[in-house]
Amino acid sequence: MDYSELVSIRNNSVEEISSWLWVTEDNGAFDGPKSDWGPLKQGILDHVKNFDVVVQAGGNCGMYPRLLSDMFKRVYTFEPDPLNFHCLSYNCQKDNIYKMNAALGETNKLVRMQRVSMANVGGHRVSDTGDTFIPTFTIDQLALDKCDYISLDCEGYEPNVIAGAMETIAKFLPVITLETVNEEINMLLSPLGYKRIDGHFGHADKLFAVK
């Protein structure tokens, strides 16, 4: 599909990286993550012990997977929206970034996705009222040999993603950051020894680690 009328190059620098291909109408999914990256990066440096493998979702237009690729040897990023993924593919051309045009969830199935606003393309979400069907996979299906960090901003779908990652989490005990936290997540992570770490890791991210 031709997205040329919907995207443009944005020369705002993030960590000395510029020339981002981005959805022209969007500001929310660029400005917010850009300002959050500093405290989130510091949280990663403070709590992650090894920097081999990170799983990240949603990949959005590619800012965080691209930045994480300078910290980790391998980055697995998932982004279900075709337009966002088009930008992500342009922005994330490093060989250590593995890109999937799909969502993460608790099982392998098709779900509906709703596009919320082109002014914030990070707000697209899984919803029963969505008009687009997208595939979901589980983190456990990746059969990773290592996993040091899981970063999830899935617009409320985080409990489903964690449920589909329990084998991986139990095996490797990665540091986890989540935008949405509820009792279901606490019930999944607490038996493994996870604690929520106090601190500021961006405007909405919460960090969990085994201490």
Locations of the language-model features?
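Short, glycine/acidic-enriched loop or turn micro-motifs at the edges of active sites
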Residues: 59-63, 82, 106, 154-156, ...
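S-adenosyl-L-methionine
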Residues: 1-95, 128-129, 144, 187, ...
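Conserved beta-strand termini and adjacent loop/short-helix elements that scaffold enzyme active sites
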Residues: 25, 100-102, 137, 199-200
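Short beta-strand segments
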Residues: 101, 151, 177-180
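Short internal loop-to-helix segment that lines adenine-nucleotide cofactor pockets
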Residues: 31-55, 110-114, 123-172, 183-188
